[in-house]
């Protein structure tokens, strides 16, 4: 009797890399299925960069997990061919360090750098205990009592990324979608993959950038590009929904910070991040 074929998930397909022509070089492809606006979703860049570094750092099976990941994004990514250039900075006993550049060919024959990241890798399975202090998950309505993305505002409604994920916002923090932002600068909700793929460490890294911009809750609609991103991965997530919280405290001079925290279905904190975002200051009338 033939065993049933293993399911093929969109996220895993998007993270497929193949060997390049130089040491530390890998190739990948961005299709049109992870687009937000006209560009490829930044969370996918983070996960792809981590996937390439995992190959470089986990040769001995010691350091399979990103523990910290920091990136800048010089230019916006687009669907098409991707070159990843990885360099190991230090291979340690318990933690290793590396950097990765994500490049794409430009129309004029030059090469555009899309992301440059440095990362710390280790084994989160060996760092699950002891838990001396941690942040508890906020009490929010369950996914079935939250608001889906069916009524996404116009420029998000044309983003193929929404087809790849199931995202639910609490009614209290979804008012911006109806033109009624709370002004608090807070979003609470749930996220999972639309095709049923269960979360892992790379998908937590992706999910840290998967929610709508917290700027929307301030009534700042439009594009808020990520300028710098830093994440800490704290544990392997349990199966099920990921609970996400986004907050901001400072929006000044066209720059804002966005802090994210993610808990798994058991209530364990599995990821946290801070990113510096830009927003366009309205021109004076």
Task: Show where each model-derived region lies.
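Terminal targeting signals and extreme-terminal segments of soluble enzymes
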Residues: 1-285
């Amino acid at each position: 009797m033939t065993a049933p074929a293993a399911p093929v998930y969109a996220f895993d397909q998007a993270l497929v890399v193949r060997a390049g022509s130089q040491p530390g070089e890998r190739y990948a492809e961005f299709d049109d299925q992870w687009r937000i606006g006209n560009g490829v979703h930044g969370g996918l860049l983070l996960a792809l960069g981590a996937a390439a570094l995992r190959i470089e750092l986990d040769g001995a099976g010691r350091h399979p997990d990103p523990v910290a990941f920091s990136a800048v994004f010089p230019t916006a990514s687009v669907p098409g061919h991707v070159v990843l250039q990885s360099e190991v900075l230090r291979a340690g006993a318990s933690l290793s360090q590396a950097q990765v550049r994500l490049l794409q060919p430009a129309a004029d024959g030059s090469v555009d750098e899309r992301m440059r990241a440095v990362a710390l890798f280790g084994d989160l399975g060996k760092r699950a205990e002891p838990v001396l202090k941690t942040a508890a998950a906020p009490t929010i309505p369950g996914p079935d009592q939250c608001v889906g993305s069916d009524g996404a505002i116009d420029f998000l409604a044309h983003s193929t990324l929404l087809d790849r994920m199931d995202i639910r916002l609490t009614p209290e923090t979804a008012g911006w979608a109806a033109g009624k932002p709370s002004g608090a600068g807070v979003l609470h909700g749930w996220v999972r993959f639309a095709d049923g793929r269960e979360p892992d460490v790379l998908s937590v890294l992706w999910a840290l950038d998967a929610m709508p911009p917290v700027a929307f809750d301030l009534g700042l609609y439009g594009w808020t590009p990520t300028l710098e991103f830093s994440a800490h991965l704290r544990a392997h997530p349990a199966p099920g929904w990921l609970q996400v919280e986004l907050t901001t405290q400072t929006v000044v001079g066209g720059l804002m910070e966005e802090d994210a925290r993610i808990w798994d279905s058991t209530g364990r904190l599995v990821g946290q991040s801070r990113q510096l975002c830009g927003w366009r200051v309205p021109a004076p009338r």
